[in-house]
Amino acid sequence: MAPISIRDVKKSYGKHPVVHGVDLEIQSGEFIVILGPSGCGKSTLLRMIAGLEEITGGEIAIDGRVVNQMEPRERGCAMVFQNYALYPHMTVAENIGYALKVAGVAKTERSRRIAEVAKALSLEPFLDRRPAALSGGQRQRVAMGRAMIREPKVFLFDEPLSNLDAKLRIAMRAEIRRLHRRLGATSIFVTHDQTEAMTLADRLVVMNGGRVEQVGTPEEVYHHPVSRFVAGFVGTPAMNLLEGTINDEGVFVYDQSRKIALPRERAAALKGKRVVLGMRAEAARLVVPDAPGALVATADFIEELGASRVVHADFDGLPFAVALTEAVSVKSGDPIGIAIDHNAIHLYAADTGRLIENSAMSGAGAVHA
């Protein structure tokens, strides 16, 4: 186990910056997930930690030692890649133990440690097979075993589950979490998959455009997103976002005429401001269209998710998602009313996209169509 300090780390390719001054403190034994869309710099940051990319600026320290000038093999990290990176001509046992062989570890000790790793990853029946004879999940476990056997201070995972089908991804998420509990090593996992991020992380690091948008537990990031980007990126469905203006009466006005009344004490300081109102799908519920204060819309399509459903509504071209857990009869094309939980509203500055502090609403008024 080892703490990691990332201080004002930058990366540029020529004149093109791709990582802009990232600061992050990772505790010893912590499981960190870096989440973001393609091209946000998350894999580049991971590769700089591993030593596979040069650092343009800033400093990375692992276990108290600055590693900027260290070779990858000197950093105490083991990396698991998306494409497994197994040697096709070697057996599972040979793949797992290859790093020890190169390091000159005695054959008896190699065999003992290979057996331990194979048992931990349920690979014992496959030790004499070659990668071509394995399933995708088995190959990924071999890749993990090859990292485990080195007994590293830090595990680095670069989208390791992307090539697996949905069922295998679920199984491998559980496998990785069990592995982390067993070994206790500091782990950094890069993904664009929100489900992976939310289920694996002790803390999430959400990146966008080479910058860190938010760091926090999955619960903090989901329930208290600090920017419009995080609100719209984290969560399935994404947070409902409506852009409008706070008028002189302290009412949020969007789509020219639709209105949501806000608490006077919050709206008073925001009169005349362009803001983005955000609300999770589960903070809304369906009511009859003529219910007092209901937002009138049309059910566009319904996602059936087994234990729950999501109604994707359309009102004059604006999308709005409502999560249902109770049995409600609704089908595409039905007129619906939407009631919202004003305690769950967040406001973001339209120009910067940042959360307006203390913008979680309480005691707000009705919604008017």
Curated annotation (Swiss-Prot):
It holds the Pfam family OB_MalK. It is found in: Cell inner membrane. It is a peripheral membrane protein. One of its GO terms (cellular component) is ATP-binding cassette (ABC) transporter complex, substrate-binding subunit-containing. ATP binds at G36, P37, S38, G39, C40, G41, K42, S43. It catalyses: sn-glycerol 3-phosphate(out) + ATP + H2O = sn-glycerol 3-phosphate(in) + ADP + phosphate + H(+). GO terms for biological process: carbohydrate transport. Residues 4-234 form the ABC transporter domain. The keyword Cell membrane applies. The complex is composed of two ATP-binding proteins (UgpC), two transmembrane proteins (UgpA and UgpE) and a solute-binding protein (UgpB). Belongs to the ABC transporter superfamily. sn-glycerol-3-phosphate importer (TC 3.A.1.1.3) family. Part of the ABC transporter complex UgpBAEC involved in sn-glycerol-3-phosphate (G3P) import. Responsible for energy coupling to the transport system. This is sn-glycerol-3-phosphate import ATP-binding protein UgpC 2. The gene is ugpC2.
